[in-house]
Each structure stands twice: as structure tokens, then as C-alpha cells.
From Swiss-Prot:
Keyword Secreted: no
TM annotation in the entry: 5-25, 44-64, 81-101, 108-128, 135-155, 218-238, 327-347
Chain segments annotated as coiled-coil in the UniProt record: none
GO (cellular component) term, any one: plasma membrane
Name of the protein described by the UniProt record: Probable low-affinity inorganic phosphate transporter
Biased composition regions of type Basic and acidic residues, renumbered to the chain: 381-390
Entries under Pfam families matching the protein: PHO4
Function text: Low-affinity inorganic phosphate transporter.
Region spans: Disordered: 377-396
Gene of this entry: pit
A single MF term (Gene Ontology): phosphate transmembrane transporter activity
Key words, A-Z: Cell membrane, Membrane, Phosphate transport, Symport, Transmembrane, Transmembrane helix, Transport
Cell compartments where the protein resides: Cell membrane
């Protein structure tokens, strides 16, 4: 086996690993509000999301072409560069998942690839007009649009149903949330799976298996990416689901449906035009907007501020990881460079996973009241069994915002 074929295999495996992390990292985009409002049981929600991500991945390839052709010069691409960019995306995804921050998998991937490209040949190898016009500007516009649409939609929902009893309204909107959340999952699969398709497409063009004039990736690439993102989604990114569903605002069913519908509309529209949009930023913007649009609603601006900070540093920090990885793999060179680079990625991933087990967040405790941070007030054991000191522990620290929705009693039903 020659070194280029070996590198291609490593790149494809790493790309599918990124797609897998994208699935569990971004599950919260679609299902956090439905889980928080009690519209769907947690395990049922992630199952629906996985199926619809799988279906959505087959609906379009416009974003895949953007990733493969519109951000960096395809003639200057090497397999080392693609691998390094993927490492940047995976490491950033795992770090933000550990912290429960819903940052952009899309921007992590793009940042990693651009950083590796700069490390390889300098800034002239990057199509900056493409980065600005198809990544940065759409992200800013989409996030702001999602906030506005989410706020207006929520305000309208509450205005229209003002005279309807709350119990009746909540019941009906929970049913509606099943449809709106499903639409977001479908949109996520349509938008995000394509990004990994685009990376593998780029690698195949670099290797020479696919013509640089090809407009769509091979069918096997589409199928593998669809399966990878669906499998990751089914695991459920509980840490990020908790932040989106409980951390920023307290979600009621009318808010949830308004936020999800707003997100789906923006994401599907962007996918149609081939924009490499961050579904995370759109969904987070919609949730924030729902908090602003609800009469008497509250937003935890500290949590929102941490998210915004993560968004700002995603491109440069993921790019830095991609650049360092490229230097390591390139300087060592050959089989040793590829093996060492891949081994470092595995080691970093395992270390982050072990750290996350110290306080486990899963379907059993994802809807616990937010007490100031992701894991505050949660049981640190794997089984979440009640301890004799749980009562005093929870009462000792008064949470800043206490949930009052009536679905608390059923959140452990799954």
C-alpha cells in the first residue's frame, strides 16, 4: 500500500469520525426544546432525530460542493492538509461538548481546514472571498435573523393564544413540537452531513479518484456520511441538550415550537443556496429569540455570553489545532507522521471522554433544574442514584432560576 492510499484511508476514517461527533454534538439543535418542554421523552427524541438526519443527508449536495470547491484552492490540497483540518474540527467539537457549549461544528471544520492550509502554503491558498461570503457573513445574518424570527414567532403565538387556557395550549403545542423538531432534524441532516461529504470529496479529488470537475460526491460517500451522522445523533449530545433546553431560557411548548419552526426555515433556505451555515448558531438564536418574545420571559445572559464567546473563537482556535497537526504530520512525514497524528487524535478524544464521566449528563438528568452551570446539582455517579445528602445539597444553593413547568414529574419516564 503506497503512502497516499494509506493517508486517504486515514482521512476517510477521520472524516466519518468528525461526522459522528457532529451528530451527537448537534442533536441539541433539533431536540433540546422538545425534551425541555416534555413534548418528547429524551430517548424517543434522539431516535427520531437520528432517523431524520439519515434521511436529510440524501436530500442535497450543494453544501458539499461549497466545502470542496469554494473555500480553498483544490489544486493545492493535500491529504495531510485535509487530515489536519479534520483533527481541528474533531478536537474543538469534543472540547465544546465537554463544556456543554453549543458551538458550530461547521465552523470548527472550516477553521481546521483553513488553518492547516495557511500552515502549508500561507494565506494565499485560501479563497478568502469564499470564506467571508459563504461562511462568515451568512453566519452573522442567519443568527440575527433566527433571533428576530424566533422572537416574533413566539410573541405572535402567545398573542394569538392569550385567551386559551394554558393547559390546553401547552398540550396542543407539544404535539406541534413533534413536527417542528422533526423538521429541524431533517434540515440538520440536509445541511451538516454534506460538510463531511465535501471533505471526503476534497480528499478524493486530491488523490485523483474523482475528477476536479465533478459536481457531486460519489454515492458511497453520501451513504457513509448519512449513517455516521445518524449514529452520532442517536447517542444524544446530552450535555449540549441540557444547555440549550435548560441553561439559556426556560422552555414552554409554545416557545419550543416557535423556535424550532424558525430554525428549520432558516436552515433549509441556506442549504438550498449552498451556504455552509452553522445550524447550532441558528437554533441557539431561535431559542434566545423565544426567550425574548415570551411575555415575562427571562434569558440567562451569562450563558448566552459564553456561547457567543465560543462562536467568536471557533474559527481561529480550530484553525490553530489544524495548523499544529499539519506541522506535526508534515515534519515527521510518511507512515510515521500519519500514525502519530492519528494516535494523538485518539489520545485527546479518550482523555476528553474520561473527563466527561466525572459528572455524567444523560437522558436521566438532562432536564434537572439549571443551578448556575452545566453539572451543578447533578449526581456525579454513573447511575444517578439518590444519596442521603441530595436534599440538603440542593437546598443549600438556591438556583438563580427555578423551573416551574409541569413536565418535571415525567422527565425520568424514559
Amino acid at each position: 500500500m503506497n503512502i497516499n492510499l494509506f493517508l486517504l484511508i486515514i482521512v476517510v476514517i477521520t472524516a466519518l469520525a468528525f461526522d459522528f461527533t457532529n451528530g451527537f454534538h448537534d442533536t441539541g439543535n433539533a431536540m433540546a426544546t422538545s425534551i425541555a418542554s416534555g413534548a418528547l421523552a429524551p430517548k424517543v427524541a434522539v431516535f427520531f432525530s437520528a432517523i431524520l438526519n439519515l434521511v436529510g443527508a440524501f436530500l442535497s449536495t450543494a453544501v458539499a460542493a461549497t466545502i470542496a470547491k469554494d473555500l480553498i484552492e483544490a489544486d493545492l490540497v493535500t491529504l495531510e492538509l485535509v487530515f489536519a483540518g479534520l483533527v481541528g474540527g474533531i478536537v474543538w467539537n469534543l472540547l465544546t461538548w465537554l463544556l456543554g457549549i453549543p458551538s458550530s461544528s461547521s465552523h470548527a471544520l472550516i477553521g481546521g481546514i483553513v488553518g492547516a492550509r495557511i500552515a502549508a502554503v500561507g494565506g494565499h491558498g485560501v479563497i478568502w472571498s469564499g470564506v467571508i461570503s459563504k461562511v462568515i457573513i451568512p453566519a452573522i445574518i442567519a443568527a440575527l435573523l433566527a433571533i428576530v424570527v424566533g422572537a416574533v414567532a413566539t410573541w405572535l403565538v402567545y398573542a394569538i393564544t392569550r385567551s386559551v387556557p394554558a393547559m390546553s395550549t401547552d398540550t396542543r403545542f407539544r404535539r406541534g413540537q413533534i413536527g417542528s423538531a422533526s423538521l429541524v432534524s431533517l434540515a440538520h441532516g440536509t445541511n451538516d452531513a454534506q460538510k463531511t461529504m465535501g471533505v471526503i470529496f476534497l480528499a478524493l479529488m486530491s488523490y485523483g479518484t474523482v475528477s476536479k470537475t465533478a459536481s457531486t460526491p460519489p454515492l458511497w460517500v453520501i451513504v457513509c456520511c448519512a449513517i455516521a451522522i445518524a449514529a452520532g445523533t442517536y447517542l444524544g449530545g446530552w450535555r449540549i441538550i441540557r444547555t440549550l433546553g435548560k441553561g439559556m431560557v426556560e422552555i414552554k411548548p409554545p416557545q419550543g415550537m416557535a423556535a424550532e419552526s424558525s430554525s428549520a426555515a432558516v436552515i433549509l433556505l441556506s442549504a438550498h443556496f449552498g451556504y455552509a451555515l452553522s445550524t447550532t448558531q441558528v437554533c441557539t438564536g431561535s431559542v434566545l429569540g423565544s426567550g425574548l418574545g415570551k411575555p415575562g420571559g427571562e434569558v440567562r445572559w451569562g450563558v448566552a455570553g459564553r456561547m457567543a464567546t465560543a462562536w467568536l473563537v471557533t474559527l481561529p482556535l480550530a484553525g490553530s489545532v489544524g495548523a499544529v497537526t499539519y506541522w506535526i504530520v508534515h515534519l515527521i512525514g510518511g507512515y510515521p507522521g500519519a500514525v502519530i497524528g492519528f494516535s494523538l487524535l485518539v489520545a485527546a478524544s479518550v482523555a476528553i471522554y474520561i473527563r466527561s464521566r466525572k459528572v455524567k449528563v444523560d437522558h436521566k438528568n438532562v432536564n434537572e433544574n439549571w443551578e448556575g452551570s452545566l453539572t451543578a446539582g447533578l449526581d456525579g455517579s454513573d447511575e444517578h442514584k439518590p444519596h442521603s445528602d441530595v436534599g440538603p445539597k440542593l437546598s443549600a444553593t438556591l438556583p438563580r432560576y427555578r423551573s416551574s413547568h409541569h413536565t418535571v414529574g415525567v422527565r425520568n419516564a424514559s
